[in-house]
Amino acid sequence: MSTILEKISAIESEMARTQKNKATSAHLGLLKAKLAKLRRELISPKGGGGGTGEAGFEVAKTGDARVGFVGFPSVGKSTLLSNLAGVYSEVAAYEFTTLTTVPGCIKYKGAKIQLLDLPGIIEGAKDGKGRGRQVIAVARTCNLIFMVLDCLKPLGHKKLLEHELEGFGIRLNKKPPNIYYKRKDKGGINLNSMVPQSELDTDLVKTILSEYKIHNADITLRYDATSDDLIDVIEGNRIYIPCIYLLNKIDQISIEELDVIYKIPHCVPISAHHHWNFDDLLELMWEYLRLQRIYTKPKGQLPDYNSPVVLHNERTSIEDFCNKLHRSIAKEFKYALVWGSSVKHQPQKVGIEHVLNDEDVVQIVKKV
């Protein structure tokens, strides 16, 4: 472990010393690729044993979505969780109070949302310091990250936390790079650019790929990509998670400072202690989770509006709905009757591939 950390430290120092220009781009690209490989080793060391096995760290996934609270120690994560979900997570006015993952659950708009108060991340978590590695491993399983920041401390904390999460392959509020990449057995490196590139050229791409011992591949760049984007695609283990920045303790700042905070993208100012602005926070959480509620309607009965079937936005077909209820239903499926905004007629007969909208009502008709 220490040798990996030493190598990472040496590469980061060299990158900091190297001036960024066209002449050094290939060298920097190579260093970035080496750094990504070392970080992968750090995340998943060889010769498993299934993790550290420390008590309280991984929590069984329950509910329709999982939200992780990430932040430096003593920024108010535990207070926020207790006030949102009524869960007691040990709170004190000194750092490192929460030492295990504390789960809570809230019901919002019919969906059950699991909330995880993760132990405070300290600087250097991605390098194995503190319990940061286990914390970030749990953060990777979340559908949404709440990054809790103390608005009395500068936004430098935000940059540090983003840097820690980036080091573990978590990309916040980003989409996967629009790059086509396929390895092949022969034919060398074939690079196609659909738009002019400001950083990547054939030589730099070959340099990065050679670090991964890849000498035959087809690559299509569909936008002006960076070497970091290409490395993310090659690594293939990146997680893209939406993030909301919660600037806590707004009861201790002026109105003018609050106006500045409101201009920060993906940001909600709150006071966990005084329950201020929780409505805005929950509404934004719902928007970022992109969940869809589908109501069931048994034959001859009224729809059940109390317990919706909750689907994730990218998986909202009738087949996904059937599988969420029970896997056997899709096999016995004949057709479905749908009421709602996804159909022209009320009701409309649809097949298993029909895509549903939020708050549609569905009645399944099985084969006889």
From Swiss-Prot:
Q: What does this protein do?
A: Catalyzes the conversion of GTP to GDP through hydrolysis of the gamma-phosphate bond in GTP. Dfd/deformed is required to activate 128up in maxillary segment cells.
Which cysteine pairs make disulfide bonds? Answer: none
Family matches, as Gene3D superfamilies: 3.10.20.30, 6.10.140.1070
Q: Tell me which residues make up the TGS domain.
A: 290-366
- OBG-type G domain: from which residue to which, for each copy? 65-290
Q: What is this protein called?
A: Guanylate binding protein 128up
Q: Which residues bind GTP?
A: 71-78, 117-121, 248-251
Provide the species name. Answer: Drosophila melanogaster
GO cellular component entries:
cytoplasm
Per the record's keyword annotation, is GTP-binding included, yes or no?
yes
Name the tissues where it is expressed: Expressed in posterior-lateral epidermis of the maxillary lobe.
Which gene is transcribed and translated to give this protein? Answer: 128up
The reply to whether Nucleus figures as a keyword in the UniProt entry is no
Task: Output the Gene Ontology terms for molecular function.
Answer: GTP binding; GTPase activity
Q: Which Pfam families match?
A: MMR_HSR1, MMR_HSR1_Xtn, TGS
**Example GO biological process:** cytoplasmic translation
Family as reported in the entry's similarity comment? Belongs to the TRAFAC class OBG-HflX-like GTPase superfamily. OBG GTPase family.
- PANTHER family recorded: DEVELOPMENTALLY-REGULATED GTP-BINDING PROTEIN 2
Locate the (3S)-3-hydroxylysine modifications and list their residues.
K22
Q: Which UniProt keywords apply?
A: GTP-binding, Hydroxylation, Nucleotide-binding
InterPro entries (alphabetical): Beta-grasp_dom_sf (IPR012675), DRG (IPR045001), G_OBG (IPR031167), GTP-bd (IPR006073), GTP-binding_2 (IPR031662), GTP1-OBG_CS (IPR006074), P-loop_NTPase (IPR027417), Small_GTP-bd (IPR005225)
